[in-house]
C-alpha cells in the first residue's frame, strides 16, 4: 500500500513541476494538485505511523506482567486516536473534498472509534504486577476477578466485531480428545493430587495449538457476562466462566459440553492469564510442572493477542486503501461547497481592500 501511495505522490509531484516551469503564476489547477499531493502525503504518514506500532516486537513470555497486557491495549487505543486525529487534520488542512471527507468520516466512525473503545475497555481488565504465567508449585489456583474478566470479554468482543468477518474463526472449534480436554481442569484444581502436571499442561498446549487465534478470539467474544467467581471448573460453560472458576476440592474436570471445546478452553486460559488475580496451579514440589503450565498460559495469550493485532492492522490498512482509492478519483470540481465558498469569500475580501 505504501508503494501505491508513494507512486501517486511522485506522479503528482512531476505534474506540479511541469505546471510550475517557466515561472508561470499558480492557477486553480496547480493549487488543486498541490492540495491533493499534500493530502496524499498526509495519509502516507498516517500509514507509516501505524505500521511502526504494529511491527514493533511484543514478545509474550510467561513472566510478562498482566499490567503489560493492559498497556498493550492502551497503546492500541492511543494509536487509533492518533490515526483519527491525523486523518481529520489532513482533510481540514488540504482541502475539503467531499468524496474523501465522507470516506474518512465513515472509516473513523465505523473502525477507528470502535477499536479504540474496545481497547480502552479491555485495558481495564488486565491489571496487576503478577505474571500471566504465575503458577507456582505449592500454591493454590486463584479465580480471576469477575469484573476484570467481563471487561476483557466486552472490550475484545467489540474489537472482534470490527476486525473479524463472520466466516473468520469458530468459537466452537475443537480437535483434541475428550479425555485430554477434561484433564485441563487440573490447572484450576485445589488438592495436590488434583493439580496439573506436565501431562495436563501438554493437553492444554494441545488445545491451544489445535485452533487458530481467530477461533480463540471468537470464543472470547461469544462468552457471556459472569456475575461472580464462585463457580468451580466443573460448572464452567464458556471461556469467561473457565477464567473465573474457583479452586474447589475434588473439582478437577471440564465437564460441560459447551466448555469442552479447544477454542473455548484456550480462550479461558488466555482470559485467566490476562485478568486481574487469575492464577493457575501445578503439582506440589514440581517446578517443571509449574513451568509447563506457565508456558501454556503464555502460549494462549500470545496467540490471542498476535492474531488480534494482525486483524486490526489488516482492517486499518484496508480502510486507508479505501481512502487512497477515493483520493485517486477526486477531481477539481469535486471540492466541497464549503471549501469553494471559503475561497470565494477570501478573494472577495482581498478585492474589497484593494
Swiss-Prot record:
<protein>
    <recommendedName>
        <fullName>Variable large protein 15/16</fullName>
    </recommendedName>
</protein>
<dbReference type="Pfam" id="PF00921">
    <property type="entry name" value="Lipoprotein_2"/>
</dbReference>
<keyword id="KW-0732">Signal</keyword>
<comment type="similarity">
    <text>Belongs to the variable large protein (Vlp) family. Delta subfamily.</text>
</comment>
<keyword id="KW-0472">Membrane</keyword>
<keyword id="KW-0564">Palmitate</keyword>
<feature type="lipid moiety-binding region" description="N-palmitoyl cysteine">
    <location>
        <position position="19"/>
    </location>
</feature>
<feature type="region of interest" description="Disordered">
    <location>
        <begin position="333"/>
        <end position="354"/>
    </location>
</feature>
<feature type="lipid moiety-binding region" description="S-diacylglycerol cysteine">
    <location>
        <position position="19"/>
    </location>
</feature>
<keyword id="KW-0614">Plasmid</keyword>
<dbReference type="InterPro" id="IPR000680">
    <property type="entry name" value="Borrelia_lipo"/>
</dbReference>
<keyword id="KW-0998">Cell outer membrane</keyword>
<keyword id="KW-0449">Lipoprotein</keyword>
<comment type="function">
    <text>The Vlp and Vsp proteins are antigenically distinct proteins, only one vlp or vsp gene is transcriptionally active at any one time. Switching between these genes is a mechanism of host immune response evasion.</text>
</comment>
<feature type="compositionally biased region" description="Polar residues">
    <location>
        <begin position="338"/>
        <end position="354"/>
    </location>
</feature>
<dbReference type="GO" id="GO:0009279">
    <property type="term" value="C:cell outer membrane"/>
</dbReference>
<feature type="signal peptide">
    <location>
        <begin position="1"/>
        <end position="18"/>
    </location>
</feature>
